[in-house]
Curated annotation (Swiss-Prot):
Keyword annotations: Ribonucleoprotein, Ribosomal protein, RNA-binding, rRNA-binding, tRNA-binding
Summary of the function given for this chain in its UniProt record: One of the primary rRNA binding proteins, it binds directly to 16S rRNA where it nucleates assembly of the head domain of the 30S subunit. Is located at the subunit interface close to the decoding center, probably blocks exit of the E-site tRNA.
Domain of life: Bacteria
Stated name of the protein: Small ribosomal subunit protein uS7
Source organism per UniProt: Carsonella ruddii (strain PV)
Matching SUPFAM superfamilies: Ribosomal protein S7
Molecular-function annotations in GO: rRNA binding; structural constituent of ribosome; tRNA binding
PROSITE patterns linked to this entry: RIBOSOMAL_S7 (PS00052)
InterPro entries with a match to the protein in the record: Ribosomal_uS7 (IPR000235), Ribosomal_uS7_bac/org-type (IPR005717), Ribosomal_uS7_CS (IPR020606), Ribosomal_uS7_dom (IPR023798), Ribosomal_uS7_dom_sf (IPR036823)
Amino acid sequence: MSRKKRYFKTVILNDPKFGSYIIAKFINYIMNNGKKNLAQKIFYYSISIISIRLNKNPFILIKKILYNVQPNFEIKKKKIGGSFYKIPIKINLKRSLMFSMKWIVKNSKLRNENGYKNKLVGELIDSYYNNSLSTKQKDELNKIIDQNKAYSNFKI
């Protein structure tokens, strides 16, 4: 019998404004040092600016932005016969959303604008139009996947 305690997944509550699990996860990725209130203010500010600029529903905009950035495959390395191969693996929706949110947050921090709010707004608008660093990162991943399609029959 195992002596370890069972791990129970923490339940993430939907965000208060839109009632969406996806937006609550996005806010959690933005959050730094446990300051969720600040992360919510940053996210809702950036969403309001984007919806004003593009004249569209903010919830639909976020779904479209995440769809533009999310990958369908992931690369894993496996050692076969003394050499490592990059093997493309299809991933589920939750994992692809996780990658897209992480990429957007990471690449928004690299932008050259004043304040994180403006950086996030710029990255989200560029992601909507497929011009952002996040979409370029997705395209680079797709190139690697195309190069290594021959190894897709290997099991991990």
